[in-house]
């Protein structure tokens, strides 16, 4: 959403198409029930991870924007994908354009992570307090 907005698109969270990988039933009822039920998915995800590993694939969250429409989903990526080696809070932005069609431009680096995000929030609080 941030990149879409920076590109000049007026987009809100409800405009982003999401593809759930958790059963819809998990979202019905209190949040406490969600957290209690979540571990029941662990074995299935681990089995899938092991199967993908044999095929030299991994699961990655990938968000896309095309023609002003945004979506986010859990995807299987091959070991030749730039997303394959992402770990921790690392991120990749891959720009596929008319000029960068066959070989998209990649921007890769650390995402915020918990400590950087906390430092940013603290800096914002201090900035507001000094106004």
What are these regions (language model features)?
Residues 1-85, 90:
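Substrate-binding/catalytic subdomain of NAD(P)-dependent oxidoreductase enzymes
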Residues 64-131:
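Catalytic, metal-anchored helix/loop core of enzyme active sites in primary metabolism
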